[in-house]
């Protein structure tokens, strides 16, 4: 273990490894502060379950457009650098909203202001996630490709540790601290992340379009370059002739025009780079072997209404479960997630993705049935406590969700064509996040339609029954997944 860490330090440097671990730890530790947000919406603002779910859906939308951040950072350098300036910007966007919400009572007492600040905060977090992923990809490519898996393992481990710590401390903090204090405490991590950005050195980037996308746009680039060269040459000849007549005045005008030309050329390069990246990404995504599986994963999210926020209200209001216990339940969920990852990697990689996804959806329906048992109070008749049901359901639900998510990760990674893996993978993750967002909107709409609100959960059982039925809708579209694809092969 120590030897392995020394190898990573030698390959990537302490500063880079520290930044990677800190960013991913912060991503996991977000459960510490977002639990407080849930209680702020429920207890302080007294929003209904559907209204709270709507706020969360809007606030997490920035995670659905991650490729946009990647393309911009790839194509438009700031100060000659493509990564660290954007990492600084994203960290500031992550830091400032929590400071404002912690210090200003008006901002956290208005659902609109709170939603805006939470959206800005998620914009910063999503951008930081994209930038650090790009930095990892570049570091692996420039240093040692053999450490690619190791670096990913370090990042996932850091996020898991952050998730466990955030869930444990979040429940304790809510029982002993004010919500605004929790917001302020969380700012320590983004502030530390901001300082850590100064430790990482980045080489100046050239201002040329993305090399991996140039091949697919070679003809357009050549034609644009040739068309631009002719007027530029004639203009420079004209300036030289005028300069011979006008002397020093002509020289100064020539310098001014040269500077304008260079600025225009730089802007043109940025535009062409953005254009190449966008069109290259679009062409790759439109290939049936990529489009069809991604369509299935999107359908799998939007056809199943997400009632997690409604269940949170039910657990706190009807079952009277406190914040400390719910934090423990989230820790158990993280352990279930890691267990699901182990089970898939150890036993299910050779299973076809169609079969593993079918079993995953059957398992998801079972977890919803457990919620139905909890809502019907049938567990009490058999001597099973509510806390036992919640803990078991949390572990099982997160494990099964991970069994469903692992095929998505594997298929996404294997379908990405060489050269644009990072940006296309970010697009895949954005589709997954967008599907989650739409599913949350669907859940909010279902709760509103059934009249489920704070203090009124009479139709909760009906909502869960509808959710169980919807869980099997994506099974009808499994033909979109490659028939023989497994965790080892995507073909």
UniProtKB/Swiss-Prot annotation:
Membrane spanning stretches: 14-34, 52-72, 84-104, 112-132, 154-174, 179-199, 294-314, 323-343, 356-376, 389-411, 437-457, 461-481
Annotated Polar residues bias: 224-236
GO cellular component, one term: membrane
Protein's UniProt keywords contain Nucleotidyltransferase: no
Residue ranges, compositional bias (Basic and acidic residues): 249-260
Keyword presence, Iron: no
Subcellular location, record wording: Membrane
Sequence similarity: Belongs to the major facilitator superfamily. Folate-biopterin transporter (TC 2.A.71) family.
Stated role: Could mediate folate transport.
Protein name from the UniProt record: Probable folate-biopterin transporter 4
């Amino acid at each position: 273990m120590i030897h392995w860490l020394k190898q990573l330090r030698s390959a990537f440097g302490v500063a880079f490894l520290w930044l990677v671990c800190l960013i991913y730890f912060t991503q996991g530790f977000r459960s510490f502060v977002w639990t407080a947000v849930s209680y702020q919406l429920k207890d302080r603002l007294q929003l209904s379950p559907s209204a709270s779910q709507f706020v969360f859906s809007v606030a997490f939308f920035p995670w659905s457009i991650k490729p946009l951040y990647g393309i911009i950072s790839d194509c438009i350098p700031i100060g000659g650098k493509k990564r660290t300036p954007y990492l600084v910007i994203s960290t500031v966007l992550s830091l400032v909203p929590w400071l404002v919400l912690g210090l200003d009572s008006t901002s956290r007492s208005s659902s609109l202001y709170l939603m805006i600040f939470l959206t800005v905060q998620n914009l910063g977090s999503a951008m930081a996630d994209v930038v650090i992923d790009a930095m990892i990809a570049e570091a692996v490519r420039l240093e040692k490709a053999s450490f690619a898996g190791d670096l990913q393992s370090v990042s996932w481990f850091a996020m898991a540790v952050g998730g466990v710590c955030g869930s444990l401390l979040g429940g304790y903090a809510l029982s002993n601290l004010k919500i605004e204090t929790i917001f302020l405490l969380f700012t320590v991590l983004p502030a530390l992340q901001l300082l850590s950005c100064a430790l990482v050195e980045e080489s100046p980037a050239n201002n040329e379009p993305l090399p991996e996308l140039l091949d697919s746009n070679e003809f357009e680039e050549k034609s644009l370059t040739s068309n631009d060269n002719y007027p530029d040459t004639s203009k420079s000849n004209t300036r030289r002739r005028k300069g011979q007549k006008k002397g020093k005045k002509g020289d100064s005008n020539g310098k001014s025009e040269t500077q304008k030309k260079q600025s225009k050329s730089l802007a043109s390069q940025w535009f062409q780079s953005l254009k190449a990246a966008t069109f290259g990404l679009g062409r790759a995504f439109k290939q049936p072997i990529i489009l069809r599986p991604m369509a299935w994963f999107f359908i799998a999210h939007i056809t199943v209404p997400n009632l997690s926020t409604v269940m949170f209200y039910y657990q706190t209001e009807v079952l009277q479960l406190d914040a400390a216990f719910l934090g423990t339940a989230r820790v158990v969920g993280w352990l279930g997630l890691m267990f699901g990852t182990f089970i898939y990697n150890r036993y299910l990689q050779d299973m076809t993705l169609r079969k593993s996804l079918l079993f995953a959806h059957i398992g998801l329906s079972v977890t919803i049935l457990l919620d139905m048992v909890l809502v019907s109070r049938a567990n009490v008749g058999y001597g099973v406590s509510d806390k036992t049901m919640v803990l078991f359901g949390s572990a099982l639900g997160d494990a099964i969700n991970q069994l469903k998510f692992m095929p998505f990760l594997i298929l996404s990674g294997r379908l990405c064509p060489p050269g644009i893996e990072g940006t296309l993978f970010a697009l895949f993750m954005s589709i997954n996040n967008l599907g989650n967002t739409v599913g949350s909107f669907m859940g909010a709409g279902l709760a509103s339609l059934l009249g489920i609100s704070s203090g009124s959960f009479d139709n909760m059982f009906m909502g869960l029954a509808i959710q169980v039925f919807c869980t099997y809708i994506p099974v009808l579209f499994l033909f979109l997944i490659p028939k023989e694809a497994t965790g080892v092969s995507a073909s």
